[in-house]
């Protein structure tokens, strides 16, 4: 382990084999907490390569829980977090809109590390049981078309890494890894990151992980979602090719809002915001959700443009389909 950390300290990249070996040792309890923290910091300072990120993702997925389900076209819209925006739970709210639009959503998420309320926190406040067994979660998914997978329970091996992450309290390669290690074999994905310089490389990792179609999104002001406060950049993975583009609210015929307009609060406050959006109450929260759900519909390939996706998202919310999915999840995942 010492040699690996010294190599990273010299800003030398690790091979896929080296990274695989290191992570296998970590997730089987053979590395100290201090060494894990040093590794995470060294990787962050050097900059993580697609090869390193793919290796760690494959190891972590290999140690994940298996969710038995009859659904084979699941999608997730989990982001990396760590953007310090303190926004409401955008992707969690958008997940219900996507599910209401007919997409099988297996929302993967965790408690907050660097914000006030993570996806697990807000859903727990809404009465969702975070601790169902994998077989029970599979049944929920089959019945409702939506399920929440609590990352802490899905990845028991993460217990070896979590203390170092919490002690560091800053985004690391594990933030970048979380959305890549979904327990299910996803076909499509919308993945938000707070570092736009990693758009293309993250799309490459998704390709390596077998995604058929995906979008990696980096919003304005470091937001790990699409934003109405400036230019949003995306990388689209389609037919094995990666293309980069960007858009503004004006491009989509939408009104712009400042970051402070979408600030959230604690889990209970964010739960109230989520409910207000699904009830179609006009606000910057609603508009931001519509934007991100629209991007999700496009990432899934359900429609042919982000603008069409935004229109579909509005219809789904207005018809009560998104709220209906929340009520279903509250009924079955309890």
Swiss-Prot record:
Which pathway does the UniProt entry assign to this protein?
Answer: Amino-acid biosynthesis; L-tryptophan biosynthesis; L-tryptophan from chorismate: step 2/5
Residues that bind Mg(2+) 1, according to the entry?
A: 91, 225
Per UniProt, which keywords does this protein have?
Amino-acid biosynthesis, Aromatic amino acid biosynthesis, Glycosyltransferase, Magnesium, Metal-binding, Transferase, Tryptophan biosynthesis
- Quote the InterPro entries the UniProt record gives: Anthranilate_Pribosyl_Tfrase, Glycosyl_Trfase_fam3, Glycosyl_Trfase_fam3_N_dom, Glycosyl_Trfase_fam3_N_dom_sf, Nuc_phospho_transferase
E.C. code:
2.4.2.18
What's this chain's function? Answer: Catalyzes the transfer of the phosphoribosyl group of 5-phosphorylribose-1-pyrophosphate (PRPP) to anthranilate to yield N-(5'-phosphoribosyl)-anthranilate (PRA).
Q: Which Pfam families match?
A: Glycos_trans_3N, Glycos_transf_3
Q: Give residues annotated as binding 5-phospho-alpha-D-ribose 1-diphosphate.
A: 79, 82-83, 87, 89-92, 107-115, 119
GO terms (BP aspect): L-tryptophan biosynthetic process
Record's protein name: Anthranilate phosphoribosyltransferase
Question: Where does the chain bind Mg(2+) 2?
Answer: 224-225
Entry binding sites for anthranilate 1:
79, 110
Reactions catalysed: N-(5-phospho-beta-D-ribosyl)anthranilate + diphosphate = 5-phospho-alpha-D-ribose 1-diphosphate + anthranilate
Q: Which gene encodes it?
A: trpD
The cofactor note from the UniProt entry for this protein is: Binds 2 magnesium ions per monomer.
Annotated residues that bind anthranilate 2 are located at: 165
Similarity comment text for this entry: Belongs to the anthranilate phosphoribosyltransferase family.
Q: Which GO terms describe its cellular component?
A: cytosol
Q: Which organism is it from?
A: Streptococcus pneumoniae serotype 19F (strain G54)
CC cofactor: Mg(2+)
- Subunit: Homodimer.
What Gene Ontology molecular-function terms does this entry list?
A: anthranilate phosphoribosyltransferase activity; magnesium ion binding
In terms of superkingdom, the source organism counts as Bacteria
């Amino acid at each position: 382990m010492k040699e690996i950390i010294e190599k990273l300290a010299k800003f030398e990249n690790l091979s896929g084999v080296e990274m695989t070996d290191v992570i296998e040792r970590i997730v089987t309890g053979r590395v100290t907490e201090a060494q894990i923290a040093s590794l995470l910091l060294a990787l962050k300072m050097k900059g993580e390569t697609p090869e390193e990120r793919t290796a760690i993702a494959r190891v972590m997925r290999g140690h994940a829980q298996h969710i038995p389900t009859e659904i084979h076209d699941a999608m997730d819209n989990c982001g990396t977090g760590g953007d310090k925006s303190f926004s409401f739970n955008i992707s969690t709210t958008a997940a219900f809109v996507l599910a209401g639009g007919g997409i099988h959503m297996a929302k993967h998420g965790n408690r907050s590390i660097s914000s006030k309320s993570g996806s697990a926190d807000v859903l727990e406040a809404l009465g969702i049981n975070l601790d169902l067994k994998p077989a029970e979660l599979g049944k929920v998914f089959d019945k409702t078309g939506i399920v929440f997978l609590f990352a802490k329970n899905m990845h028991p091996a993460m217990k070896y890494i979590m203390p170092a992450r919490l002690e560091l309290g800053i985004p690391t390669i594990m933030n970048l890894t979380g959305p890549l290690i979904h327990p299910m074999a996803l076909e499509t994905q919308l993945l938000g990151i707070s570092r736009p310089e990693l758009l293309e490389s993250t799309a490459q990792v998704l390709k390596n992980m077998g995604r058929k179609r995906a979008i990696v999104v980096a919003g304005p002001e470091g937001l790990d979602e699409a934003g109405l406060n400036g230019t949003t950049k995306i990388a689209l993975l389609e037919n094995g090719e990666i293309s980069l583009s960007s858009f503004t609210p004006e491009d989509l015929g939408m009104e712009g809002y400042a970051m402070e307009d979408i600030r959230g609060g604690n889990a209970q406050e964010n739960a109230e915001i989520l409910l207000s959006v699904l009830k179609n109450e006009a606000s910057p929260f609603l508009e931001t959700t519509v934007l991100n759900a629209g991007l999700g519909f496009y990432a899934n390939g359900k429609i042919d443009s982000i603008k069409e996706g935004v229109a579909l998202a509005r219809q789904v919310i207005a018809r009560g389909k998104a709220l209906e999915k929340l009520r279903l999840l509250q009924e079955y995942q309890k």
